[in-house]
Amino acid sequence: MDKTQSSQGKCPVMHGANSAVASNNMDWWPKALNLDILHQHDKKTDPMDPKFNYRDAFNSLDLAAVKRDLNALMTDSQDWWPADWGHYGGLMIRMAWHSAGTYRVADGRGGAGTGNQRFAPLNSWPDNANLDKARRLLWPIKKKYGNKLSWADLMILAGNVAYESMGLKTYGFAGGREDIWHPEKDIYWGSEKQWLAPTENPNSRYSGERDLENPLAAVMMGLIYVNPEGVDGKPDPLRTAQDVRVTFARMAMNDEETVALTAGGHTVGKCHGNGKAQDLGPEPEGEELEAQGLGWLNKKGPGTGANAVTSGLEGAWTTHPTQWDNGYFHLLLNYDWELKKSPAGASQWEPINIKEEDKVVSVGDPNRKFNPIMTDADMAMKMDPEYRKISEKFYQDPAYFSEVFARAWFKLTHRDLGPKSRYLGPEVPNEDLLWQDPIPSVDYRLDASEIVELKAKLLASGLSVSDLVATAWDSARTFRGSDFRGGANGARIRLAPQKDWQANEPERLQKVLKVLIELQASLSKKVSIADLIVLGGAAAIEKAAHAAGVKITVPFIPGRGDATQEMTDVESFAVLEPLHDAYRNWQKKDYVVQPEEMMLDRTQLMGLTAHEMTVLIGGMRVLGTNYGGTRHGVFTDKVGVLTNDFFVNLTDMAYNWKPAGSNLYEIVERKTGAVKWTATRVDLVFGSNSILRSYAEVYAQDDAKEKFVHDFVAAWTKVMNADRFDLA
């Protein structure tokens, strides 16, 4: 046999790290710290030009023209995916709803803000079946308007226009959502290994009676909300009502908003289950190349229009599924309902003895009519006592229902867009809403000389470097890049609930705030407490850097306002409470998750990279900002001086590192055996993890003293300005 024949059938390429058959580091060492969540959305993956600014691009968009095109699309039925009753409104609303509906208030992740429905896993979730068709229908419009209109904005706008085209007066629309270019790595969707895994399966998201794992909101892997057939697919409206209440609360919705959204979402459109689910092909990510990113293709027939299969339930909720009306409550409340099976075998509720005029015209044959249907979640709106009261009120007052729904829909689709200062476009409502975390604008300016004078007064106030730095940090660290909440702007650290959070050391905080408020009152110039808090941190860092022999000016841009208690929803802000903070070497209690894992999660939410995290930890330790003044990780004899001592001593082989208790270690001199310092896991991980050690070594080098200070200041400034959307 010659060499040519013997080599036939072998793979012609070397298997690299991108090969599906290759094992990666996490396969070999599953307990290793995975820094990937800090390394996502790199500019290398972004196809936009370096100078591209989406805000500027969107502001140049003719939004009215886009809406005209979207209105035309709604009734321009395509043969490859026909519109139900000649109107795509229901499909577009479901797409927008499911884009926004992944948001959860606990960590601010999910939601409509990034266009992530285009990528795995969301593009292939069972609950998102056939939304790939909705996005393909939108492609001509996305293609036409190009970079002026992100997919993220287009999907929400399409849902808005769909409602408007069917008769609802919407509350408004804001653009400003920038697309990502690959799946997110930081969002925890659950630990289940199969779609729609029931509660009793391994790795369930439930414990106890029915306690849903934090921060999850959906009841099953692959669902946006609740199971439409009932808890674990077993119909029981009262049990489902409990799931609905928990799920919507974790999306920051109250009972009235929940009923409005459920009813308003089901006033239009239909469910699809007129066929066999087993006839459908794989989801988009599991399909073959020739499917070109589409999934759920019917292998035994057209599988479109009247024969489409999506959820498995079959039918519309209302008599007129292409118009906005009060028909949902008319049918739900005036008829008795019984359990039936759809053609696909799914459990659904249908009315008993329904009048002919209340039936729904068939999608495929205008001469035929069918029963409307309700899901188990819809029946919960009737069976649950509290939901029933709200449903009755909406039924009796259709105008009130329309208004509440329009506002709830706006909240649903804009919750993760952040404060109103990030909103773009001519349809932004004028009203300031409490859930937008409003902050009053400022009416003063500070020039360079006034800033210098203020810094001198702050340093002469009697507050220490650690007090000023820790207070500024505590004020700013609440920022979440997931939904753009929190941060130093507004100075809500002086208001409930933040002033009483254990993480903020209330007694120390009140001492610092008292000094700052007195200083503010003594000034001839108007300055917000929010600006004074941040400027105090800047002044303290400059002093600490100067003591280390490095002269530097910490960038400071005034303009932060002071929020009032009336502008602050205490319950809404409660989810921002830090339960751990590696930067101040503190956690409220021991958790199942290791401290270093929680450090990465907090770091990612603040929008920091791995090397920014590294330099900030090292700087915060030597500045003496540990919670309660503990000495863990303070590897220096010059506390309050901004040196690179943390890294120098961390990487020094003159020391041994020994466990001394739960999350506690002793740093021992090798020669004498004497304990030199103590440390926690979030200190020693910078010497243990190979990636973090590589950063630590950079800052430990003899030529790194100035670089360390400059990098620390840059990372610090990034945190302080994270919520300054007015500077974008």
UniProtKB/Swiss-Prot annotation:
A GO molecular function held by the record: catalase activity
In this chain, heme b is annotated as bound at 266
Q: How is it modified after translation?
A: Formation of the three residue Trp-Tyr-Met cross-link is important for the catalase, but not the peroxidase activity of the enzyme.
Species: Shewanella sp. (strain ANA-3)
Q: Name one GO biological process term.
A: cellular response to hydrogen peroxide
Specify the protein name.
Answer: Catalase-peroxidase 1
Q: What are the record's GO terms for cellular component?
A: cytosol
- Record site: Transition state stabilizer: 94
Q: Which cofactor does it need?
A: heme b
The family database entries (PANTHER family) matched by this protein are listed as:
CATALASE-PEROXIDASE, HYDROPEROXIDASE I, BIFUNCTIONAL CATALASE-PEROXIDASE
What class does this enzyme belong to in the EC scheme? oxidoreductase
Q: What does this protein do?
A: Bifunctional enzyme with both catalase and broad-spectrum peroxidase activity.
Crosslink site: Tryptophyl-tyrosyl-methioninium (Tyr-Met) (with W-97): 225-251
Write out the entry's keywords from A to Z.
Answer: Heme, Hydrogen peroxide, Iron, Metal-binding, Oxidoreductase, Peroxidase, Signal
According to UniProt, the reaction catalysed is:
H2O2 + AH2 = A + 2 H2O; 2 H2O2 = O2 + 2 H2O
Any single Pfam family the record assigns to this protein: peroxidase
Question: Entry's CDD domains?
Answer: catalase_peroxidase_1 (cd00649), catalase_peroxidase_2 (cd08200)
Q: How are cofactors bound according to the entry's free-text note? A: Binds 1 heme b (iron(II)-protoporphyrin IX) group per dimer.
InterPro entries (alphabetical): Catalase_peroxidase, Haem_peroxidase, Haem_peroxidase_sf, Peroxidases_AS
Quaternary structure and partners = Homodimer or homotetramer.
At what sequence positions does the UniProt record place the cross-link Tryptophyl-tyrosyl-methioninium (Trp-Tyr) (with M-251)? 97-225
Q: Which PROSITE patterns match?
A: PEROXIDASE_2, PEROXIDASE_4
Catalytic residues as annotated in Swiss-Prot or TrEMBL: 98
